């Protein structure tokens, strides 16, 4: 502390920094959730509306943004038809997010690569399916990614995204 005599304003600066670090902004306090959407989900509203409904992915994203705001969550919404891109986003999310919501689409039933990426994430993961995969074709009954998920939501259509946000919020609140 003898050095403080040389820099008389240093103590005030250190005290101010410590106090300001203790007061984080509301945005900084928000948990960040990455919502990943796999192949063909960019075609929602057009593809099999009798199964998936008439909402587009943009409609769902808008609803999710509003719902996340009511929960105090910050979300980023992404979609890719490319398996490797989803894997990269999951790997990057380890450092930048607090939870994942994953609607892997058809990759659910085929991708060991997604399972491996999700297995190293080590934070809450909600697996999401708009349709009830167990009421559909036999090949859809198997999910490779379920083994890495904290929980699974399926069969609630576009409302499943809000349910997934609620689940993530509860998991994050538990710590």
Go through each PLM region and give its residues.
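Short Gly/Thr/Asp-enriched flexible loops that form oxyanion-binding sites at enzyme active sites
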Residues: 111-121
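Short glycine-rich anion-binding loops that position phosphate/pyrophosphate groups of nucleotides
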Residues: 39-41, 105-108, 131-133
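Short acidic/histidine-rich motifs immediately flanking catalytic phosphotransfer sites
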Residues: 93-100
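Extreme N-terminal starter segment of soluble prokaryotic enzymes
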Residues: 29-33
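Short, acidic/small-residue loops that bind anionic groups at enzyme active sites
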Residues: 119-136
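Glycine- and acidic-residue-enriched helix-capping/strand-helix junction motifs
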Residues: 44-58
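Short, glycine-/small-residue-rich phosphate/pyrophosphate-handling segment
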Residues: 135-175
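Short beta->alpha junction loops
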Residues: 74-84
């Amino acid at each position: 502390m003898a050095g403080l005599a040389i820099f008389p304003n240093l103590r005030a600066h250190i005290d101010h920094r410590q106090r300001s670090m203790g007061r984080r902004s509301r945005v900084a306090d928000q948990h960040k959730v990455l919502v990943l959407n796999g192949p063909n989900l960019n075609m929602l509203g057009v593809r099999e509306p009798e199964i998936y409904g008439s909402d587009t992915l943009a409609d769902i994203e808008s609803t999710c943004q509003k719902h996340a705001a009511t929960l105090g969550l910050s979300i980023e919404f992404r979609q890719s038809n490319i398996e490797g891109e989803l894997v990269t986003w999951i790997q990057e999310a380890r450092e930048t997010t607090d939870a994942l919501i994953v609607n892997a689409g058809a990759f659910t039933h085929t991708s060991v690569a997604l399972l491996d990426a999700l297995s190293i994430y080590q934070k809450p993961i909600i697996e999401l399916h708009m349709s009830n995969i167990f009421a559909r074709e036999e090949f859809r009954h198997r999910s490779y990614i379920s083994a890495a998920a904290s929980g699974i939501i399926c069969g609630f259509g576009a409302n499943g995204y809000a349910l997934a946000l609620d689940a993530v919020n509860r998991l994050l609140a538990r710590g």
